[in-house]
Swiss-Prot record:
Fe cation binds at residues 218, 299. HAMAP family: Ferrochelatase. It is found in: Cytoplasm. It comes from Cupriavidus taiwanensis (strain DSM 17343 / BCRC 17206 / CCUG 44338 / CIP 107171 / LMG 19424 / R1) (Ralstonia taiwanensis (strain LMG 19424)). This is Ferrochelatase. Coiled coil: none annotated. One of its GO terms (cellular component) is cytoplasm. Belongs to the ferrochelatase family. Pathway: Porphyrin-containing compound metabolism; protoheme biosynthesis; protoheme from protoporphyrin-IX: step 1/1. InterPro entries: Ferrochelatase (IPR001015), Ferrochelatase_AS (IPR019772), Ferrochelatase_C (IPR033644), Ferrochelatase_N (IPR033659).
Length: 371
């Protein structure tokens, strides 16, 4: 096996620490071609679709990609950001803003850490971002997937790709992985503050008259639960802790699961039918929040804010409120910093004094080092 070339080593250079934020991914543009390329990579991952390749790939290439690429492109087009200060895929824009804000906060508190974001599918890829970190001299890397609840379909495949990339390196960095943070107090507090801030601006639901808060998480096939994936349990725990933090009674909020794909049974209750049923019974107001998505994306902005609202109102519902994800809100950035710092303990987070670095270089050269 041939390993990728290493950057020239320089004695006297301070080793750097990096945090790699990983999210699912996004197409490069809201076009059928770009969306098709993204979906091909995403749906070809055996962690995502656990069907024998011989049966799945012909269906994917022959039916699903030709049909879904154009339809999905229209959905991406409906949410694509085109503002002067925010242009592109919402998920990528907000992920980059999170990375910049987290690095800024850490630096303000004396922690000299490089923060970068990567996508499991699409760009910027995990491989390209890790290569950039290597070129910057990052010898310690904390991988922090933006999946609060662990799942083999998300967190595990992000780790798989990190390992695959490092398998091509001769000089590998020290590595730490954050498996989940579904019940971390800072995460729950940031969620609570996001919902409370929305209610402070737009008024609270009247739970006494039957209004409801829906906590919608991304769904996965029920089979994964039966095979030992902890995702379902972690979603329920997040929902319970958030409900308690908001001071709600169990009947005032409900955990649901969205984004079902295919005909197999997924985790239930499903979000869309739940919204339709609430509309049918004449619910006055429904608020929907997606705790499992730290950044807004097509699943929140289009599937919930647009399609979900239509489901609810067509069925007879009246007042629909979509509560945006945390994105780069200050409480969430502070929570990210707290989570990261717990996992960074023991690593050097400050650059040694230049005199110390020069002394190291001099000692190495005295022993025959070239640089």
């Amino acid at each position: 096996m041939t390993f990728s070339p290493e950057p020239a080593y320089q004695h006297g250079q301070a080793p750097r620490t990096a945090i790699l934020l990983v999210n699912l991914g996004t197409p490069d543009a809201p076009t059928p071609k770009a969306v098709g390329r993204y979906l091909k990579e995403f749906l070809s991952d055996p962690r995502v679709v656990e069907i024998p390749r011989a049966a799945w790939l012909p269906l994917l290439y022959g039916v699903i990609l030709p049909l879904r690429s154009r339809a999905s492109a229209l959905k991406y087009e409906s949410i694509w950001l085109r503002e002067a200060h925010m242009t592109g895929s919402p998920l990528l824009v907000y992920s980059e803003r999170q990375a910049h804000a987290l690095q800024r906060l850490l630096h303000q508190n004396g922690h000299e850490v490089t923060v970068a974001c990567a996508m499991r599918y699409g760009n910027p890829s995990i491989g390209s971002v890790m290569e950039a970190l290597r070129r910057q001299g990052c010898e310690q890397v904390l991988v922090l997937p933006m999946y609060p609840q662990y799942s083999g379909t998300t967190t595990a495949t992000a780790f798989d790709e990190v390992f695959r990339v490092l398998g091509q390196w001769r000089n590998q960095p020290e590595l730490r992985l954050v498996k989940h943070f579904h019940d971390h107090p800072a995460y729950i507090s940031a969620l609570q503050q996001q919902v409370s801030a929305y209610w402070a601006r737009h008024g609270m639901p009247d739970f006494g008259r039957g209004d409801k808060l829906i906590l919608s998480f991304h769904g996965v096939p029920r089979r994964t639960l039966e095979l030992g994936d902890p995702y379902h349990c972690e979603c329920l725990k997040t929902g319970r802790l958030l409900g308690e933090a908001l001071g709600l009674q169990p009947g005032q909020y409900q955990v649901t699961f969205q984004s079902r794909f295919g005909k197999a049974e997924w985790l239930q209750p499903y979000t869309a039918p739940t919204l339709a049923e609430l509309g049918k019974v004449g619910a006055g107001r429904v608020d929907v929040f997606c705790p499992g998505f730290p950044a807004d994306c097509i699943e929140t902005l289009e599937e919930i804010a647009m399609e979900g609202q239509t489901e609810f109102k067509v069925a007879g519902g009246k007042d629909f409120h979509f509560i945006p994800c945390m994105n780069d809100a200050a409480p969430w950035i502070a929570a990210m910093a707290e989570i990261a710092l717990q996992h960074l303990q023991g690593w050097a987070l400050a650059t040694p004094h230049p005199h110390e670095l020069e002394a190291r270089r001099t000692r190495a050269q005295a022993r025959g080092a070239a640089a």
